[in-house]
């Protein structure tokens, strides 16, 4: 199937825009998905606190750091062309903003960058595309799975990131000739399942 690039649009993903939208309690739909995660497979804690926020946001930071490294290395190693290349160039910029946003929010609590190993996932454009789908969908499941454990302030901030992750997933699914929105509701996964999956993929140890 011929790869298609979605219509040009303002991605609204500068750090200033992210903070403005977070402060306004933006991403209502994504925030609703996070609040509704208690009905999914995520682990729901009794009462969200600032400490649990820091732990969960660091988990999300790990995922965003992995994605940024993945797309940056893909541009260097795989060198995707055409619409797939445009996707990779756009998403690496967005993931870089996500990393900066979470790092600034966490301050001194922010985790160090991991040293991922993407192995054969970047051997060919086709393998890169398949791995990108998996990584985007894994990140979305993680956000939904931990959403109910965040304070409302953190949900408002994280919702602005989740909505962008969903658009990224839809974009790369479309490039692969698949439905960009195959389900009425996305599944949730707990952090333990997410980390185990990333280890099986060989991305982290």
PLM-predicted stretches and their roles:
Residues 2-14, 23-205:
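All-alpha RGS (Regulator of G-protein Signaling) helical domain and cognate RGS-like helical scaffolds
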Residues 18-19:
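Hydrophobic/basic alpha-helical segments enriched in Actinobacteria
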């Amino acid at each position: 199937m011929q790869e298609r690039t979605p219509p040009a649009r303002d991605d609204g993903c500068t750090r200033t825009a992210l903070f403005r939208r977070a402060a306004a309690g933006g991403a209502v739909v994504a925030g609703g998905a996070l609040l509704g995660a208690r009905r999914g497979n995520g682990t729901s804690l009794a009462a969200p606190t600032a400490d649990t926020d820091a732990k969960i946001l660091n988990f999300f930071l790990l995922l965003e750091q992995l994605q940024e490294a993945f797309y940056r290395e893909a541009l260097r190693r795989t060198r995707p062309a055409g619409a797939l290349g445009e996707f990779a160039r756009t998403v690496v910029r967005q993931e870089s903003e996500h990393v900066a946003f979470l790092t600034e929010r966490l301050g001194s609590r922010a985790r160090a960058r991991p040293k991922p190993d993407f192995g054969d996932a970047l051997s060919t454009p086709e393998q890169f595309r398949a791995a990108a789908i998996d990584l985007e969908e894994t990140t979305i499941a993680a956000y939904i799975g931990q959403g109910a454990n965040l304070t409302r302030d953190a949900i408002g901030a994280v919702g602005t990131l989740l909505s962008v992750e969903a658009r990224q997933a839809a974009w790369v699914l479309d490039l692969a000739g698949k439905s960009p929105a195959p389900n009425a509701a996305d599944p949730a996964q707990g952090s333990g399942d997410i980390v185990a999956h990333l280890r099986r993929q060989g991305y982290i140890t």
